[in-house]
Regions:
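Phosphate/pyrophosphate-binding loops at sites that engage ATP/ADP/AMP, CoA/4′-phosphopantetheine
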Residues: 60-73
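Active-site-adjacent loop and "lid" segments of alpha/beta metabolic enzymes
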Residues: 4-63, 83-171
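Active-site metal-binding loops of divalent metal-dependent hydrolases
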Residues: 80
Length: 171
């Protein structure tokens, strides 16, 4: 097996990260995160979360390309839950088609996230239904990669959406 993707929540901002990613030959996922992991949820603030996340991801993608990482190796992740309030996460999800329109494969990771708990009132171990709803909406909006804890259930849900959308032959 081995690694097939570098998924860096810091978007290669640490010293040597560009070089390591470039030299690996792997796909690279650029993740939006406002702040740092230990403090990112303290005071997240945006004027327009979708525009700001889009601008950040495009800028980091350009930085990656300048560092010698081919555009074809890049994946973008809007970073649901990474320095965002519930309102930010919901607005960003509503704007997902715009992020897909940036021209990079989009990865969405919302499985068991706190945003599901905030909306449904469910604890982490009871968030499957909310996660499946978001996974199917993300795929329908054009997200190419869905990160999930519940692989079988998510695959089944995504296959059903694809069948309804007459894309079952591509699965």
């Amino acid at each position: 097996l081995g690694a097939g993707l570098i998924n860096d929540v810091r978007s290669l901002r640490r010293e040597g990260a560009f070089e390591a990613a470039r030299d690996s030959g792997l796909a690279v996922c650029i993740v939006h995160m406002q702040g740092e992991p230990g403090t990112m949820q303290q005071t997240p603030s945006y004027s327009d979360v979708t525009a700001e996340v889009s601008d950040y991801l495009l800028a980091r993608a350009s930085d990656c390309e300048r560092a010698g990482i081919a555009r074809e190796r890049l994946v973008i992740d809007p970073g649901f839950g990474f320095g965002k309030t519930l309102a930010h996460n919901l607005a960003l999800f509503r704007g997902l088609r715009g992020l897909v329109g940036l021209g990079f494969p989009v990865l969405v990771g919302v499985s068991r996230k706190s945003m599901i708990g905030q909306v449904t009132g469910r604890p982490v171990h009871r968030r499957l239904a909310g996660g499946l709803a978001l996974a199917t909406l993300a795929a329908d909006a054009g997200a190419r990669i869905v990160r999930t804890h519940d692989v079988t259930a998510s695959c089944d849900a995504l296959k059903m959406v694809a069948a309804i959308n007459e894309r079952a032959t591509t699965l």
